[in-house]
Amino acid sequence: MCLAHANSAPQVQQVPGYFLQPVGNLKVTALFDGELGLPRSDLLGISSEKANQLFAQNFIPVDEHNHILTDFSAYLVQTPTQNILIDAGTAKCFGPSLGYVRENLKKAGVRPEQIDTILVTHAHPDHLCGITLDGKMAYPNAKVYLAKADVDYWTSTLNEAKANDFFKPLFKMARDALKPYQQAGRLVAFTQASFKVPNVEVIATQGHTEGHTSYLVDGKNGQKFLGLGDVVHYAAVQFPYPEASYKPDTDARRAIAVRKDIFEQAYQKQWWIGAAHVSFPGIGHIGKNTQGYQWIPAQYRLLK
């Protein structure tokens, strides 16, 4: 036995927070942004007893407040001609346990200036704040795409004045994140009819926010990848019980209908999914079992 090895300090760092999954001719890389506890009380439409049973059965970790520890991820999608980022993470908007997308992008071998397109699913800080770094464009060569409905709503001072204490700070965060791209003419506030990005189709998934959008990227040969956004927050519960909703949803009824519809589409069409709040890397498929829908995570594979 080598005493030098026996007495050396143990490894205390986690492996880099990225995971590469080929999808047809795409290279999809999950980028870990961090983790945060979501309150159990924000899960609605299901009894607390049933929800807690599902959390326990799935060994879901909790934080010091007994909140459900939830992963936050963004997705790099590389086509033969594009470097697309689906969501950009939190940056400094939500504290030290989040904000690692840009760092993990670089660890994955891609420089921020190589990103040409950022597709933001919605204007909440954990998806939007990361486009900006210290008041400047964090991705200086990228165009940012965000649904016009979300741009209009989350930059409005009138809506800000009417918002409750939970949502009120999010308006300034959205304006600050978007500002440098607006000033540079690099923000595209799109409608479903006006959206034009090669190889990408928008799927309207409103409910969580006014303009929430999922992005379906064509990997050819029948392979497609869906950047889902916030259709799911509590995976252990909302896959088998998609009628369970999340308190901050703008329109819970619509969010539930969207969740059921997109789960069925993804199941029938066998799309690859990138789910921002499913356990990292959040890449996999949606299947079915006797309870309902189920999450089937991607397997770690050798790259060829």
Predicted regions and their residues:
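Active-site metal-binding loops of divalent metal-dependent hydrolases
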Residues: 33-34, 88-91, 123, 149-150, ...
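Cap/insert and terminal regions of metallo-dependent hydrolase folds
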Residues: 216-304
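Short acidic/His/Gly/Ser-rich catalytic and metal-binding motifs that mark active-site loops
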Residues: 95, 153-156, 235-239
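Divalent metal-coordination and catalytic microenvironments
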Residues: 25, 77, 87, 115, ...
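Metallo-beta-lactamase
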Residues: 3-102, 106-110, 114-117, 148-204, 222-229, ...
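Active-site environment of divalent metal-dependent phosphoester hydrolases
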Residues: 16, 123-130, 195, 209-212, ...
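Active-site metal-binding motif and surrounding structural segment of the metallo-beta-lactamase
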Residues: 73-74, 96-145
